[in-house]
Amino acid sequence: MVIYNSPMDYSIERADEKQKKCLSIMEASEFEKSKRPAFHLASPCGWINDPNGFSFFNNKCHLFFQYHPYSNKWGPMHWGHAVTSDLLRWNFLEPALAPDSSFDRGGCFSGTAIEDGSFHIIAYTSVIEGNAIQNQSIAIGDGKKYVKKNSNPAITAKNIPFDYDKAHFRDPKLWKENETYFLGAVLKTDDGSGAFVIFKSRDLEKWDFVSVADRSLCELGMMWECPDFFSLDGTDVIIISPQEMKEDLELGFHDGNNSVVMTGTMDRSSWKFSRNNVSQIDYGIDFYAPQTTLAPDGRRLMIAWMHRWEGFSTPDDYLWSGMMTLPRELKIENGVLFQSPAREMDALRKNGIAGDENLPPEKEIEIKGVKGRFFDLLLSFVVPQNCEWLEMKIAKGENCCSKFIFDFKNKRISFDRSESGTRKDCESFREFRFEIPEDRKINMRLICDISSAELFVCDGRYAFTNVFYSPIEADGITFAASHEFRLEYEFYQLK
């Protein structure tokens, strides 16, 4: 595998050449194709992480992503690019950005994109080689090719009226209100904690500092990453991905990097944000850096990196590393975020079966017809007063499985992939606290795509995303409960 060692070697043309070669190898090999998801965006070649520029332009949905096509490990960041018409089948285009300019040879880091008339405008973090100083830059394109503005970088330390860590100022969120462009970014303040700062411009050239809209006082981790800002169902929303958070099982936070939603009110005169509610977005091991967009039909959609920084689970022999979650529809109820798979998922369903099953106490059973690695499973049940737990195993083979455990006694849901075949040097267990509804009825939905499991509990009040790497032939699904348990189900194979 060729690795270009000098930043001067990086170009869109070379990245595109590498991508095409890698895709052709995978297309020609049934073995390589068998490793890839059917309806999630996965890296076309090498490494991907954060979703970038999630947006609609020219009647298509565009998703860019942090990209290093030359190995399956993180390296100098490019922007990969894919488009879709149905949110399910992605077509890869040539990479949009490469670290090939004097102001971004240290990498083209994360950012966002908007449709503005006939132009597709990208805001991204440009990293200076050597000193790793991070600034914000602009590129303008037609949906296929993107040109960096000659005036880049657009926003630097000169635009900020206070001291901060100049190696930690990144991830611009771009939006437009009336005729004014706004750009929100995150930076590390003098005490090491993160802040969400806002700038404005009339022409994408001259930017004025507006406010510190919100910041961590070290209670929400340290440096913040990948901010988003939008309004939904009458509520203003800021999304951030804080680093170095401390575990708080009651609030759903775990040690390390988290992804957090803050609902409240943004004062449009002072551009200061008042929080009403703060919570985890997804409680799973493999979810980070979510980004949203507004669909033409008015839905707020979200997608995230289905991976994690604290240890990588992708097998070393893969030609690629990194996937995105399913696009999810969002809504806010009483300040709380609810998520559900984009409704386009329903078009993939086939061979549906439905019924109910009475589980005997402490006996593992299979349900006829319920098996596979590409499926959509809907479960509904009333938790018996005396029932302590329900266990569901997926990707069950002769010597492997991954399992969800619903601990009703202690109000915990956990995922355990320690026996899945996934490499042992990454985290294998995660749990979170949930509330059992007053009527004790729980609805949940699990979507599996070869090596990923996205679970939505209590109609999307809780999301729980995890990946696992088990042999493809491991396709069993079993259920067990501590006491007699009635389970209603719908099960669909997914194309």
State where each predicted segment sits.
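Beta-rich carbohydrate-recognition and catalytic domains
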Residues: 1-171, 176-220, 231-283, 304-356, ...
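Beta-rich accessory regions
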Residues: 3-5, 22-27, 257-495
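Catalytic-domain carbohydrate-binding cleft regions of carbohydrate-active enzymes
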Residues: 221, 226
